[in-house]
């Protein structure tokens, strides 16, 4: 198995920006006519906590968190390059983000994904996320699936 390295950075990181561009291309295909609606909520300029995953020094995945409420961080911009999927990388990125959220005082993470991303929904459920009523800008949006996970005060290790 190749070595996976996760780094903490911010949204200005070049590798993060390149991975997000690939994510946006994927979402444009999946979301179709709904893409412009979702894209307005996926700006990265205000994101300060970013994880970039490298396998053998190649950027293969990313994710981010940003404050959602006083107690919840929102997981944003999760992506693993298609050539590196099904290796547990996404679960490791999410776990690293959850640990970072815990370190910064959050007690839960929330996220939004799409019904057209069944593999993402399955992953999040596998690692402890539960479907919750759509929140914020996603209220009433039929293609959105919102999820929540309470965080332990102890750091976690991925089990996926």
Language-model-derived ranges and their functions:
Residues 2-76, 81-83, 94-95, 134-137, ...:
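Acetyl-CoA-dependent GNAT
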Residues 80, 86-99, 126:
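Conserved acetyl-CoA-binding loop-helix of GNAT-fold acetyltransferases
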Residues 57, 61, 88-90, 128:
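Conserved phosphate-binding and hydrolysis motifs of nucleotide-dependent enzymes
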Residues 19, 23-26, 100, 123, ...:
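Alpha-helical interaction/dimerization surfaces of two-component signaling modules
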Residues 3-4, 9-12, 17, 107-110, ...:
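C-terminal "cap" of GNAT-fold acetyltransferases
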Residues 94, 101-112:
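Conserved GNAT acetyl-CoA-binding A-motif
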Residues 71, 87, 103-107:
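Short coil/turn segments at alpha/beta junctions that flank glycine-rich nucleotide-binding fingerprints
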């Amino acid at each position: 198995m190749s070595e996976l390295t996760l780094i903490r950075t911010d949204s200005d990181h070049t590798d993060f920006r390149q991975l997000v561009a690939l994510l946006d291309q994927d979402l444009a295909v999946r979301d179709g006519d709904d893409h412009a609606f979702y894209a307005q909520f996926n700006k990265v300029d205000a994101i300060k906590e970013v994880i970039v995953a490298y396998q053998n020094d190649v950027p293969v995945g990313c994710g981010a968190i940003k404050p959602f409420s006083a107690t919840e961080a929102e997981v944003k911009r999760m992506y693993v390059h298609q050539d590196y999927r099904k290796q547990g990388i996404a679960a490791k990125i999410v776990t690293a983000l959850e640990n970072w959220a815990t370190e910064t005082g959050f007690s839960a993470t929330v996220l939004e994904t799409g019904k057209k991303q069944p593999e993402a929904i399955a992953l999040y459920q596998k690692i402890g996320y539960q479907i919750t009523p759509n929140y914020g800008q996603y209220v009433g949006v039929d293609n959105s699936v919102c999820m929540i996970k309470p965080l332990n005060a102890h750091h976690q290790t991925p089990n996926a």
